[in-house]
């Protein structure tokens, strides 16, 4: 769990540190308040879709879906940022008509909100109270290494390149799906027991609601 959260935090901190410079270069930093409002509204819509999907997919499949979607999105953004005609090296003046800056900003905000919530939902579904009390502090502590790694990479954006860092962020997101898959293979028996307990609890709640 700590490795999983570290990867999520590393990717988020890496790209979150770059979203303002990208917005400033492509759209204009004066449009940041508007970008924040758009991000909030978009996150609300995506959260509604996420709530629907939680009843249709398992937590693991949700991780795979979210990782693939955001990973592909950030790979595309990375390629577009490297484009000499419309990317960061374009001779065009910043302006609100350049959609790439908006999309990059909103995508980063949505990823941070959705992926962290999904992680804690997944963790709570496979840990009992005793395990949680002993592990949560350790998980959060180890996850700080991800934050340090992501923000450290971002400070070297001039030498590495922002488009390359977005690609690194996309790869870290894809690795989240891989770690979840490995976790399910290694701890398959424990997960089955946890999901069975959740299903039993859900059925009991429905029966109690019918009785009342």
What are these regions (language model features)?
Residues 18-19, 111-128:
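Intracellular juxtamembrane helix-capping segments at the cytosolic ends
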């Amino acid at each position: 769990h700590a490795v999983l959260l570290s990867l999520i935090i590393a990717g988020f901190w890496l790209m979150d540190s770059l979203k303002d410079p990208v917005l400033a270069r492509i759209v204009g930093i004066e449009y940041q308040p508007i970008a924040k409002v758009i991000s909030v509204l978009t996150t609300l819509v995506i959260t509604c879709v996420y709530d629907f999907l939680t009843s249709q997919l398992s937590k693991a499949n949700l991780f795979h879906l979210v990782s693939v979607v955001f990973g592909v999105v950030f790979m595309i953004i990375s390629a577009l940022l490297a484009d000499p005609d419309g990317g960061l090296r374009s001779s065009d003046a910043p302006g609100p008509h350049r959609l790439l800056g908006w999309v990059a900003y909103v995508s980063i905000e949505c990823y941070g909100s959705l992926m962290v919530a999904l992680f804690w939902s997944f963790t709570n579904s496979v840990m009992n109270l005793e395990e949680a009390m002993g592990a949560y502090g350790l998980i959060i502590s180890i996850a700080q290494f991800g934050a340090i790694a992501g923000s450290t990479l971002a400070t070297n954006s001039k030498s590495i390149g922002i488009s390359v860092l977005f690609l690194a962020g996309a790869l870290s997101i894809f690795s989240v799906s891989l770690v979840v898959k490995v976790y399910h293979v290694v701890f398959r028996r424990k997960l089955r027991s946890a999901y069975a307990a959740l299903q039993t609890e859900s059925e009991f709640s429905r029966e109690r609601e019918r009785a009342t």
